[in-house]
Amino acid sequence: MKLTIHEIARLVGAKNDVSVYPDSPLVKAEFDSRLIGAGDLFVPLKGARDGHDFIETAFENGAVVTLSEKEVADHPYILVEDVLTAFQALAAYYLQKTGVDVFAVTGSNGKTTTKDMLAHLLSTSYKTYKTQGNYNNEIGLPYTVLHMPDDTEKLVLEMGQDHLGDIHLLSELAHPKTAIVTLVGEAHLAFFKDRSEIAKGKLQIADGMEKGSLLLAPSDPIAEDYLPADKKVVRFGPGAELEITDLIERKDSLTFKANFLEKSLDLPVTGKYNATNAMIASYVALQEGVSEEQIGQAFQNLELTRNRTEWKKADNGADILSDVYNANPTAMKLILETFSAIPANEGGKKIAVLADMKELGDQSVQLHNQMILSITPDALDTVIFYGEDIAELAQLASQMFPIGHVYYFKKTAEEDQFEAMVKQVKESLGAHDQILLKGSNSMNLAKLVESLQED
């Protein structure tokens, strides 16, 4: 991080005199005092706990200066009105100072995978950095910016939204050169009036872009009203400017051809939605001068963020399709379609473990129930449901499947039948079986994956 104490003080409009402090260069910025090292800037954010309570600890760990909303005795500090606002302003300034090209990615489904793919492709020709983990909000994005290596040329930022306006703030901070909206679904519907408002929020990713900048968006009528007229909008999907013309799906890989590619591309991941993600990433990479040959080679050693549609092996030999980081109706429908289309192993069953999708608001039960259209005894032998809002879906499924092939386990404020669910999964799972696990992160299905691998 090529910034000094005095430079930061000028930028954030320090309310105190910092000229009495040495103009020391800073190593990095941290808001967790436990991660502070020698030469760091401490950023005491207010959350469940007030970061100001840990300023002393930060200096004990090596901090040379701290932002602060109040006077600090005995240590160098930069007095500001609001630490978070100063943190964000610092990140925006640093992007401007470095001149790095920013690529922003959002979407109700596929944003993390697309971010990973695009960063991987760009890294074949440029020094590239990307959002780590789920650092995609008003705190995580500036943290990512201030942690990128000094030689970064291309920065791929994931942008998430919980409320309308979240992405507007992030876009105005980052000023993307190129932006991608992967899909407009029902994620976080608890915080939005409807899917149209979700689309409005997602398309705010263009708010911080210059006129004529490239914006990739799904060919979806609900998004049309929010597409900016002053950007170069390229739509993707069936019949759109970018579309997949050929697709071969396998259990753990796929091959696809797009209308702008000369050759087919092979991917070491499953799911036709991942073909769309790869198509988007490929198109942007081509605009940046990455060759089609480089793209094809890069996809051969693609590594994605953990728990995104990942095949694993159970201890008993069964195949686990783990997709447990997050869930929304669109994502669950897509993974059920993908899993259902995969042929069963010889002598094996196909089992699905489905858990609650969170943050769907008043429509949650209804949206869960709609998943019945993607659940069929023709493709699945056994379905195990876990949660609260998923209970009615379990009842609907029990009317379609033979007795003993549908199970439901509660997770409510009063009762959590997680251990009983795990026991049933293990009793149902044979050595030649395939099992899908899908649910929101808070449903803790990652722990079930670990349990199946450890026994």
Question: Model-found features: residue ranges?
Answer:
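N-terminal leader/targeting and accessory segments in enzymes
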Residues: 1-89, 270, 373, 378, ...
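Phosphate-binding loop of NTP-binding sites
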Residues: 6-12, 86-219, 223-232, 423, ...
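Short beta-strands and strand-loop turn motifs
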Residues: 14, 69-70, 100-106, 180-186, ...
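Mobile, glycine- and charge-enriched loop segments
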Residues: 33-43, 128-129, 139, 143-154, ...
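Active-site beta-alpha connecting loops in nucleotide-dependent enzymes
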Residues: 49, 305, 324-401
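Acidic, Mg2+-coordinating active-site environments of NTP-dependent enzymes
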Residues: 68-74, 180-319, 341, 348, ...
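Short acidic-hydrophobic, aromatic-tinged amphipathic segments that line or gate anion-handling sites
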Residues: 78-82, 405-421
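ATP-dependent carboxylate/acyl-activation modules
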Residues: 105, 306-308, 434, 442, ...
